[in-house]
Curated annotation (Swiss-Prot):
Keywords: Cell inner membrane, Cell membrane, Electron transport, Flavoprotein, FMN, Membrane, Phosphoprotein, Translocase, Transmembrane, Transmembrane helix, Transport. Its main location: membrane. The gene is rsxD. The modification FMN phosphoryl threonine is found at residue 187. Part of a membrane-bound complex that couples electron transfer with translocation of ions across the membrane. Required to maintain the reduced state of SoxR. GO terms for biological process: electron transport chain; transmembrane transport. The complex is composed of six subunits: RsxA, RsxB, RsxC, RsxD, RsxE and RsxG. This is Ion-translocating oxidoreductase complex subunit D. It is a multi-pass membrane protein.
């Protein structure tokens, strides 16, 4: 009898990295479409800029490292990094910001560690945080959803603002950010945090046009539901596992509910947390990154729960209105520790 000796891994996933990345890119279509509908063509321009920047940055580093450029670019990971960063920033942010953030994400946060599979932090979120800390005004200058907007920029206007800072008619970001009440608009989370700190009551805040949505913030609720739809499709395709999204959303909802019940005059209701900002994008497309997330099922549950708790804490008590990016990176730090204490016991060996 002949015994074959094989080395690990002993189980194999037949799906290639490029196919998984492609599935994630396809799943992002509903979310992208929703952002285009509510915030205009700027999102598409940012995606194109980020995609080109990501591919060029990755190709440059691979060339310097004398590695195969074509083979690596085919894994679609650079495209996904650019896409996730592009949909996370305001649609009319200056062109150089998305280029800078994408190049930093690909070269510093990914390739500097050795490339795909070696980076401990989510590259897109590293790029986002670098931009947010460096350029806080531009990174929080979101347009009002078209439902409550006074000026809705077209495709040409979006290009002109992104590359020159103003439209052909002289309109700038201050003009484009005006809502139907004549006040510059912000995201639902940003508006809530700023208004509470200014001493406004929750009853007053909920009367603002940005909260005119059926469930949560105008426009943002549908954007989040679109990302949720894409995430459910990823689960159905088995491109991601359910542990991280579920534990993240349950923890965020639980913390938000308890906080709202105990302090309804200062803390946002759970539906605002779940359907505003980057909640669903983070739950299904960012936290589930197989490279930077936990690798065990118990670990994934802990990882998602930790991220959900951090998002609520940052949104409720921190200095930034959303907090998803910071929560992801802080949770990434804990992955080695989580994996160490949740790794399954080797058969035939005692626990401990």
């Amino acid at each position: 009898m002949v015994f074959r000796i094989a080395s690990s891994p002993y189980t194999h996933n037949q799906r290639q990295t490029s196919r998984i990345m492609l599935l994630v890119l396809l799943a992002a279509v509903p979310g992208i479409a929703a952002q285009l509908w509510f915030f205009g063509w700027g999102t598409l321009v940012q995606i194109l800029l980020a995609s080109v920047s990501a591919l060029l940055a990755e190709a440059l580093v691979l060339k310097l490292r004398k590695q195969s450029v074509a083979a690596t670019l085919k894994d679609n990971s650079a495209l996904l990094t650019g896409l996730l960063l592009a949909v996370s920033i305001p649609p009319l942010a200056p062109w150089w910001m998305v280029v800078l953030g994408t190049v930093f994400a690909v070269i510093i946060a990914k390739q500097l560690y050795g490339g795909l599979g070696q980076n401990p932090f989510n590259p897109a979120m590293i790029g986002y945080v670098v931009l947010l800390i460096s350029f806080p005004v531009q990174m929080t200058s979101w347009l009002p959803p078209h439902e409550i907007a006074v000026n809705i920029p077209g495709f040409i206007d979006a290009i002109q603002v992104i590359f020159s800072g103003h439209t052909a008619s002289g309109g700038d970001m201050n003009t484009l950010r005006l809502g139907i009440d004549g006040i510059s608009q912000a995201t639902p989370l940003d508006t809530f945090k700023t208004s509470v700190r200014a001493g406004h009551s929750v009853e007053q805040i909920m009367q603002y046009p940005i909260y005119s949505g059926i469930l949560a913030g105008a426009g943002w609720q549908w954007v989040n539901l679109a990302w949720l739809a894409g995430g459910v499709w990823l689960l159905w395709q088995k491109a991601i596992r359910w542990h991280i999204p579920l534990s993240f959303l349950v923890t965020l909802a639980l913390c938000a509910t308890l906080g709202w019940l105990f302090s309804p005059e200062t803390l946002a209701a759970p539906q605002i947390h779940l359907l505003s900002g980057a909640t669903m994008l983070g739950a299904f497309f960012i936290l589930t990154d197989p490279v930077t997330a936990s690798t065990t099922n118990r670990g994934r549950l802990m990882f998602g729960a930790l991220a959900g708790l951090l998002v609520w804490l940052i949104r409720s008590f921190g200095g930034y209105p959303d907090g998803v990016a910071f929560a992801v990176l802080l949770a990434n730090i804990t992955v080695p520790l989580i994996d160490y204490y949740t790794r399954p016991r080797v058969y035939g060996h005692r626990k401990g």
